């Protein structure tokens, strides 16, 4: 049995069609769960209820730009964007260690610091969407995957310490 990958680009395209007021509402919320109080969320997910993975994506949509289909293969990884954007590694570790919803709130602050980074939305959305249940939390709580957060940290360090072509 295969599990189909969610269509993250369809979500991006629905976001692009939102009215300016709905986009503004997405920018103003303080944490992902507050999105449930706004029309914009239900416009993004017309076919069903948005679970925690989808909420994380909706929470970040206003703070990113997709690179576009023609540049998707050449678009830098998120870790490289964070390293190039002079993001302090301690802030990145705060995100990696934080529990939900503080992890995604802090991550959104990093995206804001990068000033609308142009990224491969499909790739980044896949990292943000991944969820895991932690035994210490209520049964219906699915937090952002620790493995996905570690991958962002690893990509950051690979980008930071890998010399550019021609450098020694």
Give a label for each model feature.
Residues 2, 6-60, 64-168:
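Basic, alpha-helical nucleic-acid-binding regions used in initiation and control of genome expression
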């Amino acid at each position: 049995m295969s599990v189909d990958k969610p269509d993250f680009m369809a979500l991006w395209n629905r976001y692009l069609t939102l009215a300016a007021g709905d986009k503004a509402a997405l920018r103003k919320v303080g944490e992902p769960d507050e999105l449930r109080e706004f029309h914009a969320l239900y416009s993004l997910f017309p076919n069903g209820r948005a679970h925690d993975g989808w909420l994380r994506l909706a929470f970040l949509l206003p703070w990113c730009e997709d690179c576009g289909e023609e540049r998707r293969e050449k678009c830098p990884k998120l870790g490289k964007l964070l390293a190039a954007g002079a993001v302090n590694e301690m802030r990145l570790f705060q995100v990696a260690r934080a529990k939900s919803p503080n992890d995604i709130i802090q991550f959104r602050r990093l995206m804001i610091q990068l000033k609308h980074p142009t990224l491969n939305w499909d790739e980044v959305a896949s990292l943000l969407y991944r969820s895991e249940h932690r035994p210490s939390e209520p049964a219906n709580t699915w937090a952002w995957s620790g493995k996905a957060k570690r991958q962002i940290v690893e990509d950051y360090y690979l980008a930071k310490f890998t010399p550019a072509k021609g450098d020694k």
